[in-house]
Amino acid sequence: MTTKYIFVTGGVVSSLGKGIAAASLAAILEARGLDVTIMKLDPYINVDPGTMSPTQHGEVFVTEDGAETDLDLGHYERFIRTKMTRRNNFTTGRIYADVLRKERRGDYLGATIQVIPHITNAIKERVIAGAEGHQVAIVEVGGTVGDIESLPFLEAIRQLAAEVGRNNAMFMHLTLVPYLAAAGEVKTKPTQHSVKELLSIGIQPDVLICRSDRAIPAVERAKIALFCNVPERAVISMKDVDSIYKIPALLKSQNLDSYFTERFGLECKEADLAEWEQVIYEEANPTAEVTIGMVGKYVSLPDAYKSVNEALKHGGLKTRLSVNIKYIDSQDIETRGAELLEGLDAILVPGGFGERGVEGKIQAAQYARENKIPYLGICLGMQVAMIEFARNVAGMEGAHSSEFKKDCAYPVVGLITEWVDDEGNIETRTEKSDLGGTMRLGSQLCHLVEGSKVRQMYGSPTIYERHRHRYEVNNKLLPQIEAAGLKVTGLSADKKLVEIIEIPDHPWFVAAQFHPEFTSTPRDGHALFAGFVKAAGEYQKRNLK
């Protein structure tokens, strides 16, 4: 089987939505029965985004096999059924690290190491490896054409297209077509210059995706086709829409999928987008709206919680409720008090690192517990719920996490020094371990306690969920905490690590050490988020009565 490659680039400005466009195209091709995967090539020099600031880069998406990757991989998994792995995302830093490691070993036999051919060859090898076994591989190159950082990647995909043959490779370029109100028309010149820049690198785009706040008139599309040397049918108008899940239908309505399959000579059925039509219908026809407060420390950039945001929306789709997310900085709770939490139908405390804002999160957990408001804690959100309960219910004054206070009286949360991974291997860590790539990462087995809320929601005695943490509940202090009324309802594969806690005498108080948001999709939703949003709706109804 010969893999067909679609290389996706962007021009004029950043943040045009290359990831969404790539994922939407993949969704249509998948609906035609093709086996599709998507890769993201990131031009920054960090080895991976694992230690990057969420307020600069957005969330870190964790794959099943434990890779810390770009948030675009979350979009990919939400749009197609193929699961992403560490092969689906790599950076300039990763490539250079690998090449330099080989150079130190002497693998290059004393050759002078250069961007061409050594770096570009390494990029091509990774792209080919990531595409292996799939009929179509969509490869998104991060950054904007013209940036110095992305040049090695652009050169690599130019070479790869030539090597596999142009009947097996196509280039899709996203550009901005701005509307000038003063002139009353859209302007095509930025697109022309962007394509000119791409041509100077040796790449002729086969398809142009023109981003605008409105549909681009046929006459302007014809003009773009003429000046940029592409067929008119390959100039696609991608206007702003109120839901990203409408993009597959928007692209299909312009026969983008057919253009690719015809060029590649692929014989496949017509795309059936019934599942996406159902998603759009559910999104457009909620029965009510609930307001969920997200108490975090990275709320200045909502993309820091991208998968959580989407998972809440998916929970709303499955319960026919519109979810209004109210972002609350946990530091504001520390300074202004818990009145910031008034009027909410539910409270969610997501993951995070570092001491800043932790006391505000603890106050949020306390407010939810005392006022019987539905609460979902994720990762650190579970740990702060544990600390709050230990302090205020179990009588453990001064309880804290050793991450924030090493000499606290009751370290109810501590560093995981040893655990068994899903393959039965023993992993060990110390406080001196590097920060990057040393956490408990990836999909792990979890045993659910019979009779618990989570067992009822999942409908299964065991589940697999993805993790990203290096601190865990201290089992030595569990008996005193459980005696006070909190229950552990989920345990790790070896039943030594706490994965889920619940408060049985609370209408809905659930917290998990794992990250359920990474496995939520618009078509299937997720049991925890559907249960949480449903609980928010029930709380709202009780209050209205």
UniProtKB/Swiss-Prot annotation:
Q: Which SUPFAM superfamilies match?
A: Class I glutamine amidotransferase-like, P-loop containing nucleoside triphosphate hydrolases
Reactions mediated catalytically: UTP + L-glutamine + ATP + H2O = CTP + L-glutamate + ADP + phosphate + 2 H(+); L-glutamine + H2O = L-glutamate + NH4(+); UTP + NH4(+) + ATP = CTP + ADP + phosphate + 2 H(+)
Major enzyme class? ligase
User: What are the binding positions for UTP in this chain?
Assistant: S14, K187, T188, K189, P190, T191, Q192, K223
Q: Which domain of life is it from?
A: Bacteria
Q: In which pathway does it act?
A: Pyrimidine metabolism; CTP biosynthesis via de novo pathway; CTP from UDP: step 2/2
One of the GO biological process terms: 'de novo' CTP biosynthetic process
Ranges for region Amidoligase domain: 1-266
* Catalytic residues (UniProt): C379 (nucleophile), H515, E517
Q: Where is the Glutamine amidotransferase type-1 domain?
A: 291-542
Q: Where does CTP bind?
A: S14, D147, I148, E149, K187, T188, K189, P190, T191, Q192, K223
Regulation of activity: what does the record state?
Allosterically activated by GTP, when glutamine is the substrate; GTP has no effect on the reaction when ammonia is the substrate. The allosteric effector GTP functions by stabilizing the protein conformation that binds the tetrahedral intermediate(s) formed during glutamine hydrolysis. Inhibited by the product CTP, via allosteric rather than competitive inhibition.
Under InterPro entries, the record lists: Class_I_gatase-like, CTP_synthase, CTP_synthase_N, GATASE, GATase1_CTP_Synthase, P-loop_NTPase
The protein's matches in Gene3D superfamilies, at most eight in alphabetical order, are given as: 3.40.50.880, P-loop containing nucleotide triphosphate hydrolases
One Pfam family, please name it.
Answer: CTP_synth_N
Write down the EC number: 6.3.4.2
Q: Where does ATP bind?
A: S15, L16, G17, K18, G19, I20, D72, K239, D240, V241
Q: How does it assemble?
A: Homotetramer.
Similarity annotation: Belongs to the CTP synthase family.
**What other facts are recorded?**
CTPSs have evolved a hybrid strategy for distinguishing between UTP and CTP. The overlapping regions of the product feedback inhibitory and substrate sites recognize a common feature in both compounds, the triphosphate moiety. To differentiate isosteric substrate and product pyrimidine rings, an additional pocket far from the expected kinase/ligase catalytic site, specifically recognizes the cytosine and ribose portions of the product inhibitor.
NCBIfam families the record matches: PRK05380.1, PyrG
- Summary of the function given for this chain in its UniProt record: Catalyzes the ATP-dependent amination of UTP to CTP with either L-glutamine or ammonia as the source of nitrogen. Regulates intracellular CTP levels through interactions with the four ribonucleotide triphosphates.
Q: What is this protein called?
A: CTP synthase
This protein's species is Aeromonas hydrophila subsp. hydrophila (strain ATCC 7966 / DSM 30187 / BCRC 13018 / CCUG 14551 / JCM 1027 / KCTC 2358 / NCIMB 9240 / NCTC 8049)
